[in-house]
Amino acid sequence: MIPSKGKYYFTSESVTEGHPDKVADQISDAVLDVLLAQDPNSRVACETLVTTGMAVIAGEITTRGYADLPHVVRETIRNIGYNSSEMGFDWQTCAVISSIDKQSADIAQGVDRATNEDQGAGDQGMMFGFACDETATLMPAPIYWAHQLSQRLTEVRKDGTVDIFRPDGKTQVSFEYVDGKPVRINNVVVSTQHKDSASQADIIDAVKTHVIRPILEPSGFFDEKACDIFINTTGRFVIGGPMGDCGLTGRKIIQDTYGGMGHHGGGAFSGKDASKVDRSGAYMARYIAKNVVASGLAPKCEVQIAYCIGVAEPVSVLVSSQGTASVPDEVLTRAVREVFDLRPFHITRRLDLLRPIYGKTSCYGHFGRELPEFTWEHTDAAADLRTAAKV
């Protein structure tokens, strides 16, 4: 339980698109997008494993579309930047192994219904959404700024600003909080893969000059003299990506969401179409939580939605302000149930989730980035919530 009073520290991490687990996530979502572009009703559960010189694709897919899996895999790896055997992973030469089956008929009969509105949930489980007023995008400050650093690491590598970085990297930001509010950045950790010829001094200078200062100085939370900065603290990070660690789809679920602030139901997102409530339910929960905060009903909101496989209506819904709202949680929950239809078909329709948009979600967070495709980041329901709550 995060305290609401006194001084404490909270930390969140992010990784770059070259991190092996994120390579896997991007491949899984690339396969999903290729199929949705041809058949919006594709049922996709695509898992990826990447290791030295190899990618393995497995899962269950039912679709009228076609995906050239070796091409999809290699294009994804090329776009990330693994273009040399020296990195242990080269898009031109890596092996691609696939084992794809159709969706289980037993699962399909629980999802498919005579009328679309009665579409059942694709699985049981609980999903969480979270929002707070710590940043303009209504995300917790630690994960928001950690993602900003990771994105910057990739940006300066790809645009040529820094020529010694390689694709793999991680960032971490620790905030000091006082009475539940972020007041300053206490420490920053950055690890970036680099060329063998790069010196530690050059790496530290490049990270501070081109990554940390441009991102964190405008934040209002960063004073370099009062902040501990840790950069490549092993002294060497040449071996990275899938050569350094095996990567798997769905192993970065905390940095995909809220950086540990708020709960997580355990289900991963990448490689799954919208009939999987692990993904669509979590997106809807974020949409609800963000609209509650945007409405002014609470400065902090967490939403839990739970489903039973084959059943359209959720088995439970909880909306909590964690004691920050002027109205009871019961009132918030009732308002949410009045404004939002939480059956899977209606979630998919409201958020327009049958589009090939998921490649953009697979790195730097599924939430808190207000891209045109990210409908779950819209705050168009805020006024309706205020009306339903009668405030």
Curated annotation (Swiss-Prot):
It is an enzyme of class 2 (transferase). It comes from the Bacteria. K(+) binds at residue 47. Binds 2 divalent ions per subunit. Its EC number is 2.5.1.6. It catalyses: L-methionine + ATP + H2O = S-adenosyl-L-methionine + phosphate + diphosphate. The keyword NADP does not apply. Pathway: Amino-acid biosynthesis; S-adenosyl-L-methionine biosynthesis; S-adenosyl-L-methionine from L-methionine: step 1/1. Its main location: cytoplasm. Its cofactor is Mg(2+); K(+). Mg(2+) binds at residue 21. Catalyzes the formation of S-adenosylmethionine (AdoMet) from methionine and ATP. The overall synthetic reaction is composed of two sequential steps, AdoMet formation and the subsequent tripolyphosphate hydrolysis which occurs prior to release of AdoMet from the enzyme. This is S-adenosylmethionine synthase. It comes from Nitratidesulfovibrio vulgaris (strain ATCC 29579 / DSM 644 / CCUG 34227 / NCIMB 8303 / VKM B-1760 / Hildenborough) (Desulfovibrio vulgaris). The gene is metK.
